[in-house]
């Protein structure tokens, strides 16, 4: 069964190889604290605290696998995983902090703009894990408050039992064909950070933008919440086409022989960089710093790549041979600070155009 469909048009979109070349050029070093290695003193202090609370929008099973691996490496520390959609996590943390409740130690979000807001509010601690010193400058906060702990792609896809490769959509434009009406499943930007970022990128994309999304909204879309859901609906045959499922969920399902093929659309594919940071007022500051060091380590990042099918900015990880290299995919990208300014507009226009 086809695993990938790659369709590339000669449009002014950034390829991943161009993106990373631009990220890595120059010798600029981000300001803020120097990278902090794991020391025996940090491990001892973390074990005394005994627990770390991790709010994340990573797929639950992957987050639990990460927690288990950390607990095996550092016996005596329990990771409490609180998993939800990125926008729900943002709402929860905002409500908790407004009520002077400080439960969370480490936060991860597929919507990096959330971390920009936490930083503005003074909720994050300036802390740079050891491996983050090797990160591309544009994938870490210049003041050391957060960095990109993972990336994924918001991809098109189709059910290979319901659609033949020759008939499958190859581009976003293809999905406006009347034959796809009532046949597309799509996630929601008000719930999912991945979809918030992808929607922002598409709204700025040449030849697409809000006029395209307005037309898509007339295709009787099956609307779901999380970006983890479209690949699952696709695998079950509830809809033959998905508009914006997570690449990593689709790959995980393909690994189980689910009838899914991924499409990297001709116009470009939204690249969604997540981010993670330590909360300044978290109840377990040492365990938080030890955990986030593990999250960004080669071991932690390799787990996300191998088990979770995510993309990583750690130069020490090994990409699965079966996966299309990021350097071969045209991508759209987002500036988290600019995206953060557009959140309300995205929610308003999406609700207007899609009726949800």
Question: What are the residue ranges of the model-derived segments?
Answer:
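C-terminal capping/gating helix-and-loop segments adjacent to ligand/active sites or protein-protein/ligand interfaces
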Residues: 301-356
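Extracytoplasmic ligand-binding site segments that recognize negatively charged/polar headgroups
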Residues: 53-67, 79-97, 102-238
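A bilobed periplasmic-binding-protein/Venus flytrap-type ligand-binding module shared by bacterial periplasmic
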Residues: 155-162, 199-203, 272-284, 303-304
């Amino acid at each position: 069964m086809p695993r990938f469909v790659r369709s590339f048009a000669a449009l002014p979109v950034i390829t991943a190889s161009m993106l990373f070349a631009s990220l890595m050029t120059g010798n600029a070093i981000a300001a803020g604290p120097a990278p902090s290695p794991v020391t025996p003193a940090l491990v001892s202090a973390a074990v005394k605290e005994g627990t770390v609370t991790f709010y994340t929008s990573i797929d639950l099973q992957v987050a639990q696998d990460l927690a288990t691996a950390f607990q095996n490496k550092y016996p005596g520390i329990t990771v409490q995983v609180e998993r939800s959609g990125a926008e729900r996590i943002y709402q929860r943390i905002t409500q908790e902090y407004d009520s002077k409740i400080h439960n969370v130690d480490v936060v991860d979000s597929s919507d990096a703009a959330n971390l920009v807001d936490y930083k503005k509010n003074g909720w994050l601690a300036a802390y740079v894990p050891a491996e983050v010193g090797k990160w591309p400058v544009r994938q870490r906060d210049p003041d050391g408050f957060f960095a990109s702990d993972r990336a994924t792609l918001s991809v098109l896809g189709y059910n290979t039992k319901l659609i033949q490769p020759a008939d499958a959509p190859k581009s976003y434009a293809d999905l406006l064909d009347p034959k796809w009406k009532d046949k597309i499943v799509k996630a929601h930007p008000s719930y999912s950070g991945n979809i918030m970022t992808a929607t922002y990128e598409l709204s700025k994309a040449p030849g697409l933008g809000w006029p395209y999304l307005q037309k898509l909204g007339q295709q009787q879309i099956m609307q779901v919440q999380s970006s983890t859901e479209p690949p699952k609906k696709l695998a079950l045959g509830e809809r033959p086409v998905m508009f914006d499922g997570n690449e990593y969920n689709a790959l995980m399902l393909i690994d189980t022989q689910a009838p899914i093929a991924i499409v990297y659309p001709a116009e470009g594919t939204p690249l969604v960089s997540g981010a993670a940071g330590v909360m300044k007022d978290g109840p377990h500051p040492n365990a938080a710093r030890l955990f986030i060091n593990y999250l960004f380590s080669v071991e932690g990042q390799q787990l996300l790549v191998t088990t979770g099918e995510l993309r990583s900015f750690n130069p020490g990880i090994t990409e699965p041979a079966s996966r299309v290299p990021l350097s071969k995919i045209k991508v759209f990208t987002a500036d988290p600070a600019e995206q953060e300014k557009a959140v309300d507009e995205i929610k308003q226009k999406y609700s207007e155009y899609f009726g949800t």
